[in-house]
Amino acid sequence: MAARKAGLIALFDVDGTLTAPRKESTPQMLKFMQELRKVVTVGVVGGSDLVKISEQLGNTVTNDYDYVFSENGLVAHKDGKLIGKQSLKSHLGDEKLKEFINFTLHYIADLDIPIKRGTFIEFRSGMLNVSPIGRNCSQEERDEFEKYDKVQKIRETMVSVLREKFAHFNLTFSIGGQISFDVFPQGWDKTYCLRYLEEFNEIHFFGDKTYKGGNDHEIYESERTVGHTVTSPEETLKQCSVLFLGKDNGSS
């Protein structure tokens, strides 16, 4: 096997790119990523916290990849070691956080949707995750809400209201996954992780939500990256096989 190509990194979104949404990575994908690491530096960047990313990619995720950026890179690991951490609480302050959370909970309380469960707002190190149905819902309920949301645009409408109400907070709202959206200060999207990748002059990013409003859009459009849109983990395998391993096809 040839030596790694210097100055090049393959950077991957998690949900919809390396795994099905909120599902565990397949053995095939885990094996492929280790093969890929032999020829290029490999990193992952997800909106979820490290616990959730570990559930999907394995408990040894920070050692299985060269870079692991959880919460869009607001929590950053390199070679298994923590190299950076940003705090939403320190940035916004408790008063603004309370104002935003109170309004959002009132909005959800008044929201008429078929079902609601629990954990409507999840407080993470560098962002808030807001779910109209509640993160405690089952996988079947997730799938049903996703279909309902595509028609009724529950998340899109809610984001529009919050964006207008809290314009003075300078927040970014990013819809991702099946049931929720992330809220964080402007500039704290996935492009945040690029500050840790100054040594790379060729950054290939792979993601599924690369459209405007999707949580992969900003990094996909960044002038520092070569963006690749995928629709499934299977397509990720195929594109990477052609790009980096010189194969005509990936998974069969």
UniProtKB/Swiss-Prot annotation:
Cofactor: Mg(2+)
One GO CC term, this protein: cytosol
Alphabetical list of InterPro entries matching this protein: HAD-like_sf, HAD-SF_hydro_IIB, HAD_sf, PMM, PMM_cap
Pathway where this protein functions: Nucleotide-sugar biosynthesis; GDP-alpha-D-mannose biosynthesis; alpha-D-mannose 1-phosphate from D-fructose 6-phosphate: step 2/2
Binding locations of Mg(2+) 1: 13, 15, 208
Entry keyword annotation includes Isomerase: yes
Transmembrane intervals: none
Binding site for alpha-D-mannose 1-phosphate: 22, 124, 135, 142, 180, 182
Active-site residues (renumbered): 13, 15
UniProt-annotated binding residues for Mg(2+) 2: 220, 225
GO biological process: GDP-mannose biosynthetic process; mannose metabolic process; protein N-linked glycosylation
Reaction catalysed by this enzyme: alpha-D-mannose 1-phosphate = D-mannose 6-phosphate
Cellular location(s): Cytoplasm
Molecular function in Gene Ontology: metal ion binding; phosphomannomutase activity
Subunit structure of this chain's protein: Homodimer.
Purpose of the protein: Catalyzes the interconversion of mannose-6-phosphate to mannose-1-phosphate, the precursor for the synthesis of GDP-mannose. GDP-mannose is an essential sugar nucleotide for the synthesis of D-mannose-containing cell wall polysaccharides (galactomannans and glucomannans), glycolipids, glycoproteins and the antioxidant L-ascorbate. Can complement the yeast temperature-sensitive mutant sec53-6.
Family of the protein in this entry: Belongs to the eukaryotic PMM family.
Protein name, per record: Phosphomannomutase
Species assigned in the record: Solanum lycopersicum
